Every structure is written in structure tokens, then in C-alpha cells.
A protein has these predicted regions:
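N-terminal export leaders
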Residues: 10-31
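N-terminal secretory signal peptides
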Residues: 1-10
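Short glycine/serine-rich loop segments
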Residues: 247-371, 518, 529-552
């Protein structure tokens, strides 16, 4: 015999919507849940809206079951009083779900990383400067492999001196990607025709003395969540394998304007999670039986293997830091609101950030200079200067370090303590600091989970989530479904607590300009992604098996110049970033 809900034609998606409206999850009796589940895929054609249905009736018993999740015990009288309101609200929820909302539409509520009363932020009125490429004495390498591993800062002078051509570099990048991608699975699609056209144009312009930027003529790769007309933008998912977008991502437009040459769209973990996509698992060039980590998997792997001088990745929670660590490249996660996300897949509107992944901190600065700043299309972007030059000094910088994280037992402790000695050898006076720990920072992850579930809500409700690559407990399909049970009040409260966290972090960082931190030490990765602070992650040694470890430098809001200056000085003293994976050297 069907249950009352099943008898009213409740399908799985409507049922999830009903329960989430109540904040109902595990408290629901298992039999009721099982009875409500239809056969997957039987009643829905992808992309075709569902026919209107009469909303199911919420009963006092359902409210009673929901109280465990919402944390609010009620009396019978209170439940009876609520019933009409809750049922009326459910009708509205169903109406909202019938509206098709593209992934590119931002919520009306916008995150601002600058807390009230924040001090010493760069003045918007200051003149923005463009970095000079600098004079790096470089001769043309004798082998193609040596040429492939040169940095952006080294390639620029060679191009301008016409000791190498953009067409040669572009063909070298394409050849290496074709050769090594079967081992690395880092490429989704090559943009060969576009790249060769751009390279020929760059060579003509350079020969005439028209130098657009330090990136002119240099090949690069885009994480495949950036829209490029004429090529699929797959988001790493079989569901979007053929997706063609007409718009051009702002970072692509800006790198085009800088004269850089786009040669490939690079792998990302499906919907920007991990290193597994519909083509397989992207590999770490230092250990090819190991994943590259993610979700900026392809950008890290392709750069580390000498297939590309640089790439653009993204970070919501570790997606630049983690693969940069695993693959031994240098990554810059900018301040939230520094780089326009127009034309980029949205995962979390209040946490997504785009940034460069390169061979060095200097290269990150050269790329960041080309892509930062407002475009009138992403309303979260600030107009703030980036006053930085290659080989900027660190005189006068106040350097802090996360004392507790360095002293705690963790796998890279020996490397991290050695980093303290290097920093002291640079003549810096280190100030011990601690990020706040009194707030439930881990619980704030529901902000990311809820926003991600909203970004891909149609996939969950249509039942197409069973076509996604991974179906594990921590993979997106299950996370998206689970997020339906996050109460709206808790989501708002989490954001209010986030504001409290932002104020506390701002108070701590007023005492310093840059903070050294173990890349995954303590709660710094989650905390600074929630607050929107910038970070550079760079190689800091190698494990016995030859795989890299990393170190992070955290900055104040809009403090990328200071972070890059310290990172550049550190790399000048260590040179870990110059090592090459032996199989690709």
C-alpha cells in the first residue's frame, strides 16, 4: 500500500524539495523516504521543464520529524499553527523551481571581503602601474626541453630579442601537450587553430616593435571552466561535453589583449572538485600514478610538466593551493573581487576566485597584472592598484608566521621549520601570530555547499546527477542532494558568523603585511578562503619519493604585491621552483 505522500504523486525531486523546505533530513522515517523514490530517469527529459503538479500536503507528523534538523522543538499547538504557512510557502518554492536560472546569473546578495572599518587598504585613486618585464640576461637554450621549462620572465626577453618566435614556442607547447597528455590527462581540448593564428600575429607585431605586454607571444592554457567561443567549455562533466558558449571570459579577453597565446583548455575535476573528470584522472608529473589534485588539475599538471609556461586556474576552497602543492608549481590565489569571473563557471558566488599558476612568483605577478581589475561585468570586482615590479624588495615588510601551525605535528613540519630559517636569513623579523579559532569555522562550509547546490540545482532536480563521473559520499551529486537539507536560517546565520570571522582576521592582520603558513596548517586555508584574503603557494622542498611539498604566504586584502615580493625573495634564496619532473625534463 502506498504511503500518503507517494499516493499524491510525489517524485524524488519534489520530495527532496519538500523536505529541504522544512530543514528535514535524517529525521524522516526511512520507509517514507524509500516509498517516495521513483525509478531514475523514467519521468524526465533533460532540459524539458516538469509539468506543474499539485504540491504535497505537509502534515503535523512531518513537522515533528523535521524538528531534529531545524533544532527547534515545537508543541502540538505550534505545529498546527504553522501548517498553513508552511504549505503555502511550499507552493512558492515549487514556483521558484520552475524558473530556469543560468549558471552565469549572480545572486542579488553579494559578498564583500572588506569588513567595516578595515584599515590601510590601497587607495583606489592611486595610479595603476604596469610592471616592466625587467632585464633578465638570457641566451637561447640549446635544447627544446630547456626552452620548454623557461619562465615567462625568461621567455619575454628572448621573444623581444627575436631569438625565439611565438610560433616556435606555440608549436613546442602543442607538441608537448600532444606527446604527454596520454600520460597526464591534463588537456580537454587543444585550441590549435586559434593558437597558431595568435602566434603568427604576435611575431608580426613583435618584429615591428609593438610589444603589448611582458606576456606577448607566450603560450598559456585555460582551465576548462572559462568560456572561449568556438571551443567546448565542458566544466569537466560529460553533461556539458558539447557545451558551446558564445561569450568570452574576461580573463581570456585580457590575455588576448596582452598578446598571450591560448593553446589549450585544460582539465578540471568535474564542476571544480578534485582531479577526476570525464576523461579520467589528471596526473601529477612528479609521480604519474598519483592524481594531480584539483580542481585546477590540468593547469598545474601542464605547467609542471613543461607543456606550458603558465595557466589560469580557479579556487573556491583549495583548488589552486592543492594542485600547485602536488605538482610543484607556484600559484597565486588573489583577493576575492580582484579578477573578473565573467565567462567562468560559477560554483560559489561568494568564494570563487581566478588566478595564475606559473613557474615562479615573478611570473604570477606578470600574469596577474594583465588580468586584474573591473570589467563592468562582474559586480564584485574592486578597482584597486597593483603596484608591483619584478624583483621587488622586501625591505620594510612586516612578516608574520602562524606559530601554532608551524609548531604542530604535521607531515611537512621539517620543511616548514626550515622555511623559517630561510626567512630569517633574508633579514626579516618574524612576528608570531594566530588566526582566530573561537568561531566554528568548519561549520561555515555550508555556505560553499549551499551555493554550489544552487548553481547546479537543475541537474539535481532533473535526475541527471546520476550521469556525473563520481558518485561517492563526498562527490558533488551526493553533496548537492544533501545541501537541500541546509535550513535557510542556518545559511544566513553562517554568513553572519562569517562577517564576525572577517573582522577578527582583519584585526590580526593589521599587525603584519604578509604571513608565512604551512599550506594546509591549522585552519588557514578555509579561513582565508572564507574571508577572501590572497595567498601565494610555492614549492618548498621534496619528499623522499621525489614529490614536492609547499609553503604558503598569506596577504592582507589587495596585498598581492607584498605577498609576491616575499615569495619572489624566498624563491631567490631556495630555487625549489626551478626543479623539473625527471620524466618530462
Amino acid at each position: 500500500m502506498p504511503t500518503p505522500l507517494a499516493g499524491r504523486g510525489v517524485n524524488r525531486r519534489t520530495f527532496i524539495g519538500l523536505c529541504s523546505a522544512l530543514g528535514l533530513g535524517e529525521a524522516l522515517p526511512g520507509a517514507l523516504w524509500a516509498a517516495s523514490r521513483p525509478v531514475r530517469g523514467a519521468a524526465r527529459t533533460p532540459g524539458v521543464p516538469q509539468a506543474p503538479q499539485a504540491p504535497p500536503r505537509i502534515t503535523r507528523e512531518i513537522l515533528l520529524a523535521a524538528e531534529t534538523m531545524i533544532g527547534l522543538p515545537l508543541t502540538d499547538a505550534e505545529r498546527d499553527l504553522m501548517l498553513d504557512n508552511v504549505n503555502q510557502a511550499l507552493t512558492g518554492y515549487i514556483a521558484l523551481r520552475r524558473v530556469s536560472v543560468p549558471n552565469s546569473v549572480l545572486p542579488a546578495i553579494r559578498f564583500d571581503p572588506v569588513p567595516p572599518g578595515a584599515t590601510a587598504l590601497p587607495a583606489a585613486a592611486r595610479r595603476r602601474t604596469s610592471p616592466r618585464a625587467g632585464k633578465i640576461p638570457t641566451t637561447r637554450p640549446s635544447t627544446p626541453s630547456d626552452l620548454a621549462f623557461l619562465s615567462v620572465a625568461e621567455l619575454g626577453p628572448l621573444l623581444r630579442a627575436r631569438k625565439v618566435s611565438s610560433l616556435e614556442l606555440t608549436q613546442l607547447a602543442l607538441d608537448r601537450l600532444k606527446k604527454f597528455d596520454p600520460q597526464l590527462l591534463c588537456v580537454v581540448n587543444l585550441t590549435e587553430e586559434r593558437a597558431l593564428r595568435q602566434a603568427r600575429q604576435a611575431d608580426v607585431e613583435i618584429s615591428r616593435g609593438r610589444i603589448r605586454s611582458p606576456l606577448h607571444g607566450i603560450p598559456w592554457g585555460a582551465k576548462d571552466l572559462l568560456a572561449v567561443p568556438g571551443y567546448p567549455t565542458t566544466w569537466g562533466s560529460p553533461l556539458f561535453k558539447e557545451q558551446m558558449l558564445a561569450e568570452t571570459a574576461t580573463v581570456v579577453e585580457r590575455l588576448d589583449a596582452a598578446g598571450a597565446v591560448l593553446v589549450a583548455k585544460l582539465a578540471l575535476g568535474e564542476f571544480a572538485q578534485g582531479d577526476v573528470w570525464y576523461g579520467g584522472t589528471t596526473k601529477n608529473p612528479w609521480k604519474t600514478d598519483q592524481g594531480s589534485s584539483g580542481s585546477s588539475a590540468g593547469p598545474a599538471s601542464a605547467t609542471a610538466s613543461g607543456c606550458l609556461p603558465f595557466a589560469i586556474g580557479s579556487e573556491t576552497l583549495g583548488s589552486i593551493v592543492s594542485p600547485a602543492t602536488r605538482c610543484g608549481v607556484t600559484g597565486l590565489r588573489p583577493t576575492f573581487g580582484r579578477v573578473s569571473r565573467h565567462g567562468a563557471m560559477a560554483l560559489s558566488w561568494s568564494m570563487d576566485k581566478l588566478g595564475p599558476m606559473c613557474r615562479s612568483a615573478t611570473d604570477c605577478g606578470l600574469v596577474f597584472a594583465a588580468i586584474h581589475g573591473p570589467d563592468g561585468k562582474d559586480p564584485t570586482v574592486y578597482d584597486r592598484p597593483f603596484d608591483w615590479q619584478p624583483r621587488s624588495g622586501i625591505t620594510g615588510l612586516r612578516i608574520g608566521y602562524l606559530k601554532g601551525a608551524f609548531e604542530a605535528e604535521h607531515p611537512t613540519k621539517a620543511f616548514d621549520l626550515a622555511a623559517i630559517e630561510v626567512l630569517q636569513g633574508l633579514g626579516t623579523a618574524l612576528v608570531p601570530i594566530e588566526l582566530p579559532t573561537e568561531l566554528p569555522t568548519a561549520a561555515l562550509r555550508i555556505i560553499l555547499t549551499a551555493e554550489a547546490a544552487a548553481a547546479f540545482d537543475e541537474i539535481t532536480r532533473s535526475g541527471r546527477d546520476d550521469q556525473m563521473v563520481q558518485q561517492t559520499r563526498n562527490a558533488w551529486p551526493n553533496s548537492f542532494r544533501s545541501a537541500r537539507f541546509i535550513p535557510a536560517v542556518e545559511y544566513i546565520q553562517a554568513n553572519r558568523i562569517r562577517s564576525m570571522l572577517m573582522n577578527k582576521v582583519d584585526e590580526v592582520l593589521r599587525e603584519v603585511d604578509v604571513v608565512a603558513a604551512p599550506s594546509f596548517g591549522g585552519n588557514s586555508l578555509l579561513t582565508t578562503n572564507l574571508t577572501g584574503h590572497p595567498a601565494v603557494v610555492l614549492p618548498n622542498g621534496f619528499n623522499p619519493d621525489g614529490t614536492p611539498v609547499s609553503l604558503a604566504f598569506l596577504g592582507r586584502l589587495f596585498g598581492e604585491a607584498d605577498v609576491l615580493a616575499l615569495a619572489g625573495a624566498y624563491q631567490g634564496a631556495t630555487e625549489f621552483h626551478t626543479r623539473r619532473p625527471p620524466r618530462f625534463a
